[in-house]
């Protein structure tokens, strides 16, 4: 019997949220009626942080969403389940950057590419390329996603990106040309960016998330995709 773990509504709602300026969406979206969500817990009054609880046949998922900048969300993903299913595509100009902290995650994307993330690995793909099924073979997954609405970020870039002349709209062609998925295996550069995000004191979260998101985007601008793909061939 197939086990259903329905997160399609959460994914779609999150995509809709990042098209908002990232502040008042919770007051405008009837998210509490979404199928597959057992609880939606606003952690403040301005929509900055919201926790989504998702039930499944053999476990539980929690997504803690922070609206860091207009068009940029930082999401803590905690799953204690073996698999999840969802359907429906989301915007092709929305990128999802995933970092695996603990556990394993595997999926086959809409493009046919196989994605496998181990501890410390990073992946980038467009959200319309998301698979209908994700598996967690260890029945445990902990990680971070940074979701970018490329159009909105280009219109409202964070300060440092404006000064550097970087356009995040170029990320789609750089990392996801022809529907591909980019994977960078665990290395010190990735660990440096993400490791401290898992232990930030609450009172420092807002400024620290803003700094770390900008650091991540600057780092991705410097990534040599060709070299990383060659490294992937040698290490896989």
Task: Report each predicted region and the residues it spans.
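N-terminal functional module of multi-domain proteins
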Residues: 42-142
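Bulky hydrophobic/aromatic packing residues
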Residues: 34-37, 41, 58, 86-88, ...
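Generic low-polarity alpha-helical segments
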Residues: 1, 37, 46, 72, ...
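Intrinsic structural disorder
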Residues: 1, 52-59, 229, 234-236
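Alpha-helical bundle regulatory/interaction domains
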Residues: 108-235
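Short Lys/Arg-enriched alpha/beta "domain-start" segment
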Residues: 2-51
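Alpha-helical structural motif
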Residues: 6, 27-33, 73, 93, ...
């Amino acid at each position: 019997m197939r086990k259903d773990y329905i997160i399609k509504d959460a994914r779609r709602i999150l995509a809709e949220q990042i098209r908002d300026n990232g502040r008042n969406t919770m007051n405008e979206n009837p998210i509490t009626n979404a199928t597959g969500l057992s609880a939606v817990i606003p952690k403040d009054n301005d929509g900055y942080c919201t926790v989504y609880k998702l039930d499944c046949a053999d476990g539980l998922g929690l997504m803690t969403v922070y609206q860091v900048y207009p068009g940029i969300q930082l999401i803590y993903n905690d799953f204690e389940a073996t698999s999840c299913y969802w359907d429906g595509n989301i915007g092709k100009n929305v990128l999802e950057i995933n970092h695996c902290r603990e556990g394993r995650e595997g999926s086959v994307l809409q493009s046919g590419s196989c994605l496998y993330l181990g501890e410390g690995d990073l992946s980038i793909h467009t959200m319309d390329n998301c698979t209908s099924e994700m598996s967690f073979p260890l029945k445990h997954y902990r990680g971070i996603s940074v979701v970018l609405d490329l159009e909105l970020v280009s219109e409202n870039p964070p300060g440092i990106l404006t000064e550097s002349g970087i356009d995040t709209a170029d990320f789609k062609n750089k990392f996801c040309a022809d529907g591909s998925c980019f994977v960078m295996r665990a290395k010190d550069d990735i660990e440096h960016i993400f490791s401290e995000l898992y232990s930030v004191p609450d009172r420092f979260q807002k400024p620290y998330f803003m700094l770390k998101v900008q650091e991540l985007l600057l780092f991705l601008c410097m990534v040599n995709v060709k070299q990383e793909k060659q490294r992937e061939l040698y290490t896989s």
